[in-house]
Regions:
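Short, low-complexity N-terminal intrinsically disordered segments enriched in polar/charged residues
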Residues: 1-53, 166
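A solvent-exposed, acidic/Ser-Thr-rich amphipathic alpha-helical stretch
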Residues: 52-109
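Short beta-strand segments enriched in hydrophobic/aromatic residues
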Residues: 59, 117-119, 149-152
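Short, cysteine-centered beta-strand-loop-beta hairpins and adjacent loop/turn segments enriched
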Residues: 90-92, 119-127
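Hydrophobic/aromatic beta-strand elements that line small-molecule binding cavities or substrate pockets
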Residues: 99-104, 117-119, 131-137
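Residue-level preference for beta-strand/loop junctions
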Residues: 109-113, 127-128
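Short beta-strand edge/turn micro-motifs at domain boundaries
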Residues: 129-159
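C-terminal single-pass membrane-anchor helix
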Residues: 156-182
Length: 182
């Protein structure tokens, strides 16, 4: 199972699936990518004390909505955005955003973005591909993140297969122990 996750993550790094976006004027694209580059820099530092600085520079905290990789991870507002950033930086792993491969699409006055990323979990030796989607909004000439969704970019069939294999192996071990003890 771990090999399959590693292999899929490796494939995504070598030949990532491209996501189409709009062709935007270069100046607009560069300005819109500013908060994503800054967010990437803060994730590289992984300093929980910098969570408020990160929010002030990259995020619209009052409108912020973040959906994490787990079903129960729904964060709204400044307090919960700070909580997510601090926990990610303390416990999750090293997240690297591939900002240059970000696809941007106009959505009225806002921009929708999709970008590939990798997370190297602290206690494992492999990276998991992540896809991050969200909304950028312009305020006073600067772009800020107002919505984020982190998505595990893995084939869930591998996870289900691993669970089934683990259950079969556990049942086999228990039956073997019962047979030896009889």
């Amino acid at each position: 199972m771990l090999f399959r996750i590693w292999l899929e993550g490796h494939r995504e790094r070598i030949k990532p699936r491209m996501i189409p976006g709009n062709t935007l004027p270069e100046e607009l694209r560069e300005n819109a990518l500013r908060p994503l580059r800054q967010l990437n820099a803060y994730y590289a530092k992984r300093d929980p004390e910098l969570a408020d600085d990160c929010i002030d520079e990259t995020i619209l905290p009052d409108d912020m909505l973040i959906l994490g990789t787990c079903p129960g991870e729904i964060f709204h507002g400044r307090k919960w955005t700070r909580h997510l950033l601090q926990c990610d930086w303390k416990y999750w792993g090293r997240l690297t955003l591939d900002v240059e491969k970000c696809a941007l699409s106009r959505a009225g006055t806002a921009l929708y973005f999709v970008l590939p990323a990798q997370v190297r979990l602290d206690h494992f030796v492999f990276s998991i591909p992540i896809r991050i989607t969200g909304i950028l909004e312009e305020r006073e000439g600067l772009w800020y993140i107002s919505k984020l969704q982190f998505i595990n970019n893995l084939n869930t069939a591998y996870v289900i297969g691993a669970w089934i294999a683990a259950l079969v192996m556990t049942a086999s071990l228990l039956l073997g122990l019962l047979w030896v003890m009889a």
